[in-house]
Structures are given as structure tokens and as C-alpha cells.
């Protein structure tokens, strides 16, 4: 018997994406997500009225209780579109994509829009100017929360205050260095060589916050403007939170695409 052709209703595809960046105006995360979502939807206008679910990644910037609902309203989505926000976790963007693919494969979802944003630059600027925070709509019922709600650390970490990522990841890095027989300065060189190609991509990317190519030496060498943040990481090796950026993507079935 010949193999059965795959059901296009159950084959998940990523069909569109959008990004947003703001360096000047003061914005909130929903403002940025609107821009990113509109950019993604512009690539597939026929799917705008077919979105079944709108998922928003948890936001660190202070926002109202229902950013997904606020975003849905600003995008013109009807009440039939499911709105949700995730728990806290760096894994949640990929988890949302994986769950969307699984739901499409199971035949329970056709089109979903996934979005996330931070506006920490704007939040800090407002505070510095003595302005009130822009939390968006604050009079909405809270969005449903999805995802793993377990804390990201256990009693052992709490007991020794090993909580912030900038303390946790350097610990891993030092273990890797020790296993490889490398001192901290040699490990910095390895990390610099790993990260330098990413800066080359960023230098040509219109939505990169830092659009400068750096050499491995630039990244790995401690200097007054590239201080050691937590051994062995220099400042240029650490995550930067003070940006205003957003991204969105649309996952749908092959049939919908």
C-alpha cells in the first residue's frame, strides 16, 4: 500500500515574522508589539482574520494585567481569538512555538500569533524624568497565564543567593573552563571567539540594538568600558536589558499558509 500523503492541515509552518525597535520616543511594550505584529501580518494579510490564538511572552517591564488582551484590541481581533500570557522564563518563546506546532499537528489549532517585547529603555527614561510609568490599559481583567510556573531556582540556590543569571551562568562557565583545563583569561578568549561572529551579523541588522562589529579581542579584553561583570564575563559578554525591542511571528498549518 502506498504511503498516505501528509495532511496539510496538520503540518506546522512559520510563515511570517516582524520586529520593532525604538531608540528615541517613549513607548510601552504593547506599543512595540503592535508594530512587530503589524509587520508580520502585513506579509500574510489573508491570515489576519484567521488568527485563533494570540500568545504574549511574559514581560519584565511594568505593564497592565492584560497585555495580550490590550494587544488583541489594538490589532482589531475579535473576542473569539484566545489571548494568553506566559509564565516567567527564558524558555517561553521557544515553548510557545513548540506548543503551537504540536497543537497544529494535533488538529486543534490553525493560525497563531506569538509576540513579545520589552521597553526598559523607555521605563528608565520616564523614571529619570520624574514621569509616571506607562503601563498601558490597567482596567482589564488579567490575561490567562500558560506555561510552567515552577520557580527558576530551588532551596539550595536561594540559600547561597545564587539567583541572578549574571551569577548563575558564570558558574557554569567556570566549570566548563576547569574541565577543559583553561584559566579564566583563556576562557574569556574562547567566549570572545564564540561571540564575535554574532556581532558581525548584528552590524548589518537593522533591528540590532548594538550595530557594531567587535573582534574577539574587543569582547574578551577587560578595559574601563568593558569591565569584568562576573568572572569570567566582561560587560560585552553579558545580556543587555535596557533596550526597547519587540518581535512577533505567525505559526500556522500548511493548509492555512
Describe every region a protein language model picked out.
Residues 1-86, 101-106, 113-256:
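Conserved "HGTGT" condensation-loop signature of ketosynthase/thiolase-family condensing enzymes
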Residues 94-102:
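Conserved phosphate-binding catalytic cores of ATP/NTP-utilizing and phosphoryl-transfer enzymes
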